[in-house]
Amino acid sequence: MNWIEYHSIKELPETIWTKIAGDNPCLSADFMEIVENLHPKDSYNYAVLYDNKEVVGVIFYSIFNALSSTLMKLSIGRVLMTGTFETYGKHWWYNTSYISECDFFEMFWQLIRKQNVLAFVIRDFVCNECQMNKFFGLHSFEHIIPYSVSWIKLNDSCMNLDDFLCEMSKKHRNMYKKIIKSRNDQNISFRKEYDIRKNLHKLYPLYINVNKRAKEFKSPPIPSSFFTGLERKFGHNCFCIIMSVGNKDIGFVLIIQGTDIIIPFLMGIDYKYRELHVWHNLTIECVRYAIETRITNIDLGLTNFELKKRLGAKKININMFARFKNNVVNRFCKSFLSKLL
């Protein structure tokens, strides 16, 4: 078996990438192309494992700088990681008829182990019961769980928002009914907007508000080109639900839609209107849209599970395995690995 590496999603045959992406719109080739354009200084690598001419495995990894700009120039803070910060889930696939999980990762390790990096991160095993296979133990990888995601799975019997609210606890059901009932008195309205570019001058500052206040998952702001890239690539499978008071837009949620899933990817909020429960209102409108379009799965993403569990969301851990390249550093500094993420 041998590896062939591609350095852009545009070079990789789409039939190969589909083995990883499946129906997930936020792992699609179009989405990966947008992500590549966001970080031109990072390295993107799509490694395909062949047995003669047969594709038996594929794995994606990126190399980025995790430390200060001074150290970046010296390449001291480079981290090799399967996946990106804009995506999650398994960024690999292998044919179990040809190779086991341990053997697949062993071959991948031989491919990457001499890279000039500070650390290696294998992400993501998205499950609450994650077993470390013998490869990770043999090579002294540390099991870390830096994040979790929240999912809502709608029942087939859920035909409208009232059905959904009835499944909540009495306390939370009454809370959301009160929020919805007060909308008329507060002159609140919602609209669905596909022309993101036209509204970007109003929406982007709202997104920056949320990004600056983030506590659980702090990351650099996504540039405005991300929004226009999504509109160009996804068409009507990407849109915003915008919340307004009178004629003023006070919040929005950006939704990316797949075959049976919607992903409220990010939000923007005017915090001067905090008392109008902007987050709750926008999230409940995401649920309403999913019900009306008969979509089963809502991926509410990272952060703030305490809010999301009121809606009946389930928490799923994002498991990673990581190690420093240097054996001595790895032995004594494993506890710092999560700080790189």
Model regions: which residues?
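Acyl-donor binding region in acyl/amide transferases
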Residues: 43-44, 66-145, 259-320
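Short, Lys/Arg-enriched, disordered terminal segments
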Residues: 1-2, 99, 338-341
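Membrane-proximal basic amphipathic "stem/tether" segments
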Residues: 324-341
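A generic structural signal for secondary-structure junctions
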Residues: 22, 312-313, 337
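A conserved beta-strand-loop-helix scaffold within acyl/acetyltransferase catalytic domains
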Residues: 2-73, 122-275
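Short alpha-helix boundary/capping motifs
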Residues: 231, 317-319, 335-337
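Short capping/connector residues at structural and topological boundaries
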Residues: 169-173, 312, 326
